[in-house]
């Protein structure tokens, strides 16, 4: 009886280990990709955010929004639309059923010559599994 109990405990521990490994390996995480065009819903004022200043020249942006009401970001190869739920001068919080996106503004300059704002920000996106990705971005907002 004792041997059977030990065998059962060993099998249970082995199953838990294998299940835990498979769950961790199965997690996708968060990869932020580039948008290849503006979503059709955007009409009027917008902001676009880039991973690097080189991406600005190539017009390769990772986030765009329509006057801060909705944000669009490519996550794991899928275009996600998130809605604004809270904001102040430096933070914007967007959510949808799968993700929470925080845009933290760390610096802003206005260019009267070109009629837009230049922004330095951090994008923090989190999924329901609490996986997070944080990237520094450079943005331009205007009409």
Task: State what each model feature region is.
Residues 1-24:
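Bacterial Sec-dependent N-terminal signal peptides
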Residues 23-85:
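An ectodomain-focused feature that recognizes extracytoplasmic/extracellular
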Residues 46, 79, 100, 131-132:
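Short, solvent-exposed loop/turn motifs
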Residues 68-70, 100, 120, 132-134:
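Exposed beta-strand and adjacent loop surfaces of beta-rich binding modules
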Residues 77, 86, 105-109, 139-141:
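A mature extracytoplasmic/lumenal domain signature
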Residues 82-83, 103, 135:
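Short capping micro-motif at the N-terminus of alpha-helices
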Residues 88-128:
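Acidic, glycine-rich flexible loop segments
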Residues 133-143:
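Short, low-complexity, Pro/Ser/Thr/Gly-rich segments in the mature regions of secreted, periplasmic
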């Amino acid at each position: 009886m004792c041997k059977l109990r030990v065998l059962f405990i060993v099998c249970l521990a082995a199953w838990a280990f294998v299940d835990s490994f498979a769950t961790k390996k199965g997690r996708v995480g968060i990869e932020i990709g580039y948008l290849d065009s503006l979503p059709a819903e955007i009409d009027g004022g917008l902001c676009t955010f880039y991973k690097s200043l080189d991406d600005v020249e190539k017009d390769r942006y990772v986030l765009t929004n329509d006057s801060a009401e909705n944000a669009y970001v490519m996550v794991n190869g899928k275009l996600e639309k998130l809605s604004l739920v809270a904001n102040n001068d430096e933070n914007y919080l967007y959510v949808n059923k799968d993700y929470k996106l925080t845009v933290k503004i760390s610096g802003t300059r206005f260019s009267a010559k070109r009629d837009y704002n230049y922004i330095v920000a951090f994008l923090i996106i989190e999924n329901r599994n609490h996986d997070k990705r944080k990237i520094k971005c450079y943005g331009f907002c205007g009409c």
